[in-house]
UniProtKB/Swiss-Prot annotation:
It comes from Methanocaldococcus jannaschii (strain ATCC 43067 / DSM 2661 / JAL-1 / JCM 10045 / NBRC 100440) (Methanococcus jannaschii). NCBIfam families: TIGR00288 family NYN domain-containing protein. CDD domains: PIN_LabA-like (cd18726). One of its GO terms (molecular function) is RNA nuclease activity. This is Uncharacterized protein MJ0482. InterPro entries: CHP00288, NYN. Gene3D superfamilies: 5'-nuclease.
Length: 240
């Protein structure tokens, strides 16, 4: 789609050319008026275009929310979860989360001792490896907090058993984000499970078929959305 200021530009160029003809040449104010109008209309056209883009974006956002689609940021605590005893399949995690929405960010946090083979496997499965020389939890928590303020993300999924992420999760929920936690026993923090909107335990939900997972998702995860919707409707009724 052509932006309106381009159409205005073409129209005014024609007027300007006409003003160059001998029949209008003596009317210098006419030419000046064309130039002034060009710059004025160009700015107006730019403003109108931006407003149209903003309106279109809002309409799309509302339609997306009605359908229950989520834009998910997936953060995986590598040292805590990518262990032989858990035998985690990153593709399976992606498949399970696809039931909730689209994964727009997928990161695997690793320490400096991660093998080249593991890093290569993470990349080959379409995830972004983030290698830290320090505490992996700190870097992951910092990124998680930044995502709380990202308007393009409405759901944050953690793959971890660690309660260190509770502050970041609380902040996310305060800002209206949904939180999914994927973990495994032993050592899966009870506090982490209680604060999440939806919990997936590796070894349980990962063995469920698609129909059962969909049923569990609707029964628990989407109830949070219904409560949020009721809250918004109540606030709208209270407005004068």
């Amino acid at each position: 789609m052509k932006s309106p200021h381009k159409v205005i530009y073409c129209y005014l160029i024609i007027l300007y050319k006409l003003s160059s003809c001998h029949i209008y040449y003596k009317y210098i104010p006419f030419r000046l008026t064309v130039l002034v109008n060009y710059f004025l209309l160009l700015n107006v056209g730019e403003i109108m275009w931006k407003k149209l883009e903003s309106l279109t974006s809002k309409i799309y956002e509302k339609a997306r929310k009605r359908k229950g689609e989520h834009r998910i940021a997936l953060l995986i605590d590598g040292p805590n979860m990518l262990r032989k005893e858990f035998n985690i399949d990153l593709d399976k995690i992606r498949e399970v989360l696809s039931e909730f929405g689209d994964i727009v960010i997928g990161r695997v946090y690793l320490n400096q001792y991660a093998s080249d083979k593991l890093i290569e496997a993470v990349i080959n499965q379409g995830f972004e490896p983030k290698i830290s020389a320090g505490d992996v939890d700190v870097e992951m928590a910092v990124d998680a907090t930044e995502l709380v303020f990202n308007p393009n993300i409405d759901t944050i999924a953690y793959v971890t058993r660690d309660a260190d992420f509770l502050p970041a999760i609380r902040k996310a929920k305060e800002r209206g984000k949904k939180v999914i936690v994927i973990g495994a026993e032993p050592g899966f923090s009870t506090a982490l499970q209680n604060i999440a909107d939806y919990v997936i335990k590796i070894g349980e939900e990962f063995q469920l078929d698609r129909e059962k997972l969909e049923k569990k998702k609707k029964n628990k995860f989407l109830k949070v959305e219904e409560k949020q919707k009721d809250k918004e409707e109540t606030e709208n009724r209270e407005e004068p």
